[in-house]
Each structure stands twice: as structure tokens, then as C-alpha cells.
Design a protein with these regions (language model features):
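Intrinsically disordered, glycine/charged-rich C-terminal tails and inter-domain linkers
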Residues: 1-109, 259-355
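Catalytic NTP-binding/metal-coordinating core of nucleotidyl cyclase/transferase enzymes
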Residues: 110-194
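A structural signal for short, well-ordered beta-strand segments and their strand-loop junctions
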Residues: 125, 217-221, 261-266
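Short, solvent-exposed loop/turn segments at secondary-structure junctions
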Residues: 131, 225, 269-270
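Catalytic core of nucleotidyl cyclases, primarily class III adenylyl/guanylyl cyclases
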Residues: 160-185, 204-243
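Internal catalytic or translocation cores that form aromatic/hydrophobic pockets or channels
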Residues: 195-200
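Short, surface-exposed, charged loop/turn segments at secondary-structure junctions
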Residues: 232-247, 276-286
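A contiguous pocket-lining binding segment that forms or flanks enzyme active sites
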Residues: 246-263
């Protein structure tokens, strides 16, 4: 009863997406929230903010909306004072349980009306090459084929004990894909998933007729982003989309990837059980070994028996860092990826050397 009443009030505070609920705390008679207009954060974190502390303000907001939105009673007043706003009080007719399970349930509810920030998450981008040149029916077939490759990769990995809780948003001619779970294992598992999707797609292309299976341009990066729930009609959905440094860099990367090419961003991140940050080459080796250790993994009814990186691929003898510059003059580094697989004697090469 109290949760239903809370949901109704949060929906009113949200005002069809006009406002954002930043955080919450228990109160003896209900709940306290900090609710701001959606434009507030842009002004508060602007370099031209009257305080002159735009960057410090942004760091504060990122910390506030990272992880749980649940705060201590005193803390929510401190946060409101820092923002220059007053907490909102939600009066409930019956008390809420303050146990861990209840906190988690309320937190998930609040997040649908909130904005989140993650500092380090793996994201993949699959882009269908020359998509606009195909007939509408072929476009639909190619998107369906890519979706099937993702679902197939998920199913194969799950059977081997690796569950990639992936989410995706469409770009129109492809998808951004990320792991809903956070941490070193989920990040490298997404790379393993990424490689398996590309292998499944390559095998399908070998067998397909022209136009039905897409030629992909693909990129992978680890970085920070914001996460928002999608607003549909009068309700926020349980589905979300991401935007931020990692998606911006992926968009830059994909512009320089040739058809059938694969790029990785120039990142440093944690691998499971590693004591220091590592780059794309170490991530690739980890995912390759993970795939080859899966004795039950079969693609097109064939055992994946070998994966060898090309000499020009990231971490190999002829590898070099590619400088990518977008139309706005913003530059970043990229790593080319290429590898050959063996499916019970059937060789297949993936990736394109970008000179």
C-alpha cells in the first residue's frame, strides 16, 4: 500500500519527465526526496556557474547519482543545501519497512525517475555498413540477423556459465550494447560476447545470400556515462538508455572503421583478479582464452578450436595506435583488431587492417 502511494507521488514529482529525482531518505512520516528540473544540472555544472566551481559541481553530482540513491536523513539535507534547493516531503499513510530488501526495492523505483552515472562500463557498438543503400526489406532482414547473432551469443555463453545481462539501444542502423551488471567480470564478459557476436555474424555471412546478413563495422570501449530511464507516454519505463563519454568516443571510433573492421578505444580498466589497470590487448587475450576454454561452445555445429590475432591487431608485433579525429576536431586513440578462427578445420578471418 505504502509503495503504491509512493509510486503515485513520484510520478507526480517527475511531471512527465520535466523533473529528476536525485536521491531519497527515510523520514518518520514518509520519505524525503531531492527533486530538480531537468535543466538544473546543466546550469549547475556549467563553467559559467556563478560559483565558478562548475567542475567541482559536476564531480559532486556524479558522486550523488552513482550507485544507490539512498541517503542518510542528515545527508539529504546537506546535499539539498549544496544544491541550493529544499528537500521534498512525501507523506505516506502507512510506514515503510526500513530493512535492506525494502531499501533496494525503493531505490530501484526511485532510479526510474532519476539519472544515474557510471564511471567505468564496457559498451559495444555494432553498425551495419552501407545500411541506407539496401531496400527496406533487406534493412529489416539485416537488423533481425544482427539481433539473432546477439541472442545466439548470449545463449551460447549462458550454457557455458557466463551470463551477459545485456541491454541495447538502437542507432537506426545498429545498436549500442552494454552489460547491465557492473565490474571487472561484466566488462570483460561483454568483450567476450562482442567477439562471439562478430564470429556468429561472420559465419552467417559465409552461408547467406547477398543482402540478408549484414557486414558490420564494430567498436568496443570502456568509459563513463549517464543512464536515463526512457519516458513513454505518462510513465517512465524499466528500460534505459546511456549517453556520455563512452558513447561519444564510440561514435567517433565507428566513423573510421571500414566495413568488416573492428576498433577498440584506448582505455585502461580492471581485469578480474588483476592488481593494476590494463589496456585493450590484455582484455582481448583474456576474452580469447575464455572462449577457447569453453569446451561445449559450438558455432554452426562446429567446435571453435583456435583464435589467432593478426600481426597488426592490438597488442601484436605490428600494432599501432590509430589517431581518430572527428568533424569537430576532437581526437582520440583507437586500436585495430583482427583475428583468425578455426572451426574444426574451417578457417575464417575477422577484422580489416586500417592503414
Amino acid at each position: 500500500m505504502a509503495l503504491d502511494q509512493l509510486e503515485t507521488t513520484l510520478k507526480k514529482q517527475w511531471r512527465l519527465g520535466q523533473s529528476i529525482v536525485l536521491c531519497w531518505a527515510f523520514d518518520p512520516n514518509g520519505l524525503l526526496t531531492i527533486v530538480i528540473p531537468h535543466y538544473f544540472l546543466g546550469n549547475f555544472t556549467s563553467p559559467s556557474h556563478p560559483s565558478g566551481d562548475g567542475q567541482k559541481n559536476e564531480d559532486f553530482i556524479r558522486q550523488l547519482i552513482s550507485g544507490s540513491r539512498f541517503k542518510a536523513h542528515d545527508e539529504i539535507f546537506e546535499n539539498a543545501s549544496r544544491l541550493g534547493v529544499a528537500p521534498s516531503f512525501i507523506k505516506l499513510d502507512s510506514p515503510l519497512d526500513t530493512g535492506d530488501a525494502s531499501i533496494e526495492m525503493i531505490d530501484e523505483m526511485i532510479k526510474r525517475y532519476s539519472l544515474g552515472h557510471e564511471e567505468s562500463r564496457a559498451v559495444a557498438l555494432f553498425d551495419i555498413a552501407d545500411f541506407s543503400l539496401f531496400r527496406p526489406f533487406e534493412q529489416a532482414s539485416q537488423l533481425n540477423s544482427l539481433s539473432y547473432s546477439m541472442n545466439s551469443a548470449y545463449s551460447k555463453l549462458k550454457r557455458e556459465g557466463v551470463e551477459v545481462n545485456f541491454a541495447r539501444t538502437t542507432t537506426g542502423d545498429g545498436y549500442y550494447v552494454w552489460n547491465r551488471d557492473l565490474g571487472a567480470f561484466p566488462n570483460v564478459d561483454l568483450l567476450t560476447f562482442f567477439l562471439l557476436v562478430l564470429i556468429d555474424n561472420a559465419v552467417a555471412r559465409e552461408k547467406s545470400q547477398t543482402g540478408t546478413v549484414p557486414t558490420l563495422r564494430s567498436a568496443f570501449h570502456i568509459g563513463s556515462h549517464y543512464e536515463l530511464s526512457q519516458a513513454e507516454g505518462i510513465n517512465p519505463t524499466v528500460f534505459s538508455y546511456i549517453v556520455g563519454d563512452v558513447t561519444i568516443k564510440l561514435a567517433r571510433l565507428i566513423d573510421t572503421v571500414p566495413p568488416a573492421g573492428i576498433h577498440m578505444g584506448d582505455f585502461m580498466a580492471n581485469l578480474p583478479d588483476a592488481s593494476s589497470l590494463v589496456g585493450p590487448a590484455e582484455f582481448l587475450r583474456y576474452s580469447r582464452d575464455e572462449l577457447l576454454d569453453m569446451s561445449g561452445l559450438r558455432i554452426d555445429e562446429k567446435q571453435l578450436s583456435d583464435i589467432q590475432f593478426e600481426s597488426w591487431s592490438a597488442g601484436q608485433s605490428e600494432a599501432r595506435l590509430i589517431e581518430v579525429t572527428d568533424k569537430h576536431g576532437m581526437s582520440q586513440g583507437a586500436h585495430n583488431v583482427g583475428f583468425a578462427i578455426d572451426l574444426e578445420g574451417m578457417p575464417l578471418a575477422l577484422g580489416m587492417r586500417n592503414r
